């Protein structure tokens, strides 16, 4: 549920996302850790394609590798805040159809259901994450600043009567466009989006899927997606645990996988989950799993009150010129161990429109204040419609 606590936290927060999607130089692999297959490298891009530096951030390399009981391999990375996360790779020859329940759990995949119809839905969800591009040679970059969170009507953004594209209401924002599902609580949000084609000027943005909560200072926004970098049409996949309640304790800035790259037109698949005090982040590009991170949450942390599907303008930058961004196969799960999901279109959704001044204006793009707005809702997705840069 959206409350005034949410807006207060947002107004009080001075934290902004800087230009955190920077290409990072390909680095030396850990000697004892396996490299991804050639096919995976071709699918996701190579380090040279995003080669430069982890500018303004901290370059992270794997410090250890551990074989888990069911056969997956966990590569450990230490974060500057003193915590660590693991990026988990499937075993060689992994087949999600025949894998044990224990292995599916290690890999952050939902339980295999019974019944033909349920199996068809389940296979469509897990198939994009079944081919591994993960290895100990992957380099991550934690940027120096965390992200803001999307604003809702309670933040005083000039919401009026319900817009045609938002069954649960709407607001304007200077930084976000997309929908927020408000039929939670949720433990899992999944879906795909098409990586947009953007210009090469000094502008950047990102598209992501996440879970959020507004329960005071314990609130957490857990999100994963892909950026559109300055100077390039695509960008690096990333994950982040952001303290949406206002306290920065135990949270991190965006952590980008600089060994992978999402090109314009690529299908980016996201699976964001939490269970107890553990957050899970999966990102796949064209069916190759590149991020399968497991990150601890501080005691008392709360998330899953809403599910967010957003395009975000990098603070301080003009929004790049862009193609429209199609979100598809969007589903949520009410329980971590459940194999029952609910499609996007059957839930209450709240629309957020990106504008020049943060106020809401009725679409379409003929209104010069509108930068990007969500519409074209189907049972399983929608489109973020680009209008103009600003």
Regions from the language model: what does each represent?
Residues 2-41:
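Secretory targeting and sorting signals
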Residues 41-390:
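Exposed, interaction-prone regions of secreted/extracellular proteins
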């Amino acid at each position: 549920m959206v409350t005034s606590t949410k807006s207060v936290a947002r107004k009080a927060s001075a934290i902004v996302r800087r230009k955190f999607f920077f290409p990072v130089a390909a680095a030396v692999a850990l000697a004892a850790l396996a490299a991804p297959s050639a096919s995976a490298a071709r699918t996701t891009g190579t380090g040279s394609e995003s080669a430069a530096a982890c500018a303004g951030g901290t370059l992270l390399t794997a410090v250890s590798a551990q074989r888990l009981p069911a056969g997956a391999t966990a590569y450990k990375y230490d974060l500057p805040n003193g915590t660590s996360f693991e990026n988990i790779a499937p075993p060689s020859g992994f087949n999600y159809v025949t894998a044990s329940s224990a292995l599916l759990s290690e890999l952050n995949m939902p339980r295999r259901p019974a019944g033909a119809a349920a199996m068809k839905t389940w296979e469509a969800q897990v198939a994009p994450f079944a081919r591994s591009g993960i290895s100990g040679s992957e380099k991550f970059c934690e940027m120096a600043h965390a992200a803001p969170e999307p604003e809702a009507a309670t933040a005083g953004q000039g919401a009026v009567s319900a817009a045609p594209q938002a069954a649960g209401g709407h607001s304007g924002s200077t930084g976000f466009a997309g929908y927020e599902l408000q039929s939670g609580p949720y433990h899992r949000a999944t879906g795909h989006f098409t990586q947009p084609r953007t210009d090469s000027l000094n502008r950047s943005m990102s598209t992501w899927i996440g879970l959020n909560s507004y329960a005071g200072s314990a609130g957490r926004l857990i999100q994963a997606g892909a950026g559109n970098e300055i100077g390039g049409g695509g960008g690096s996949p990333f994950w982040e645990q952001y303290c949406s309640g206002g306290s920065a304790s135990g949270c991190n800035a965006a952590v980008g996988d600089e060994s992978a790259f999402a090109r314009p037109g690529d299908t980016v698949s996201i699976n964001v989950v939490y269970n107890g005090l553990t957050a899970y982040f999966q990102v796949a590009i064209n069916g190759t799993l590149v991020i399968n991170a497991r990150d601890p949450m501080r005691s008392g942390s709360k998330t899953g009150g809403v599910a967010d599907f957003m395009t975000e303008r990098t603070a301080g930058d003009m929004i790049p010129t862009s193609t429209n961004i199609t979100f598809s196969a969007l589903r949520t799960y009410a329980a971590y161990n459940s194999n029952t999901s609910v499609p996007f279109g059957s839930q209450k959704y709240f629309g957020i429109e990106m504008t020049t001044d943060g106020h809401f204006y009725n679409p379409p793009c003929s209104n010069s204040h509108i930068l990007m707005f969500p519409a074209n809702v189907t049972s399983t997705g929608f489109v973020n419609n680009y209008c103009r840069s600003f």
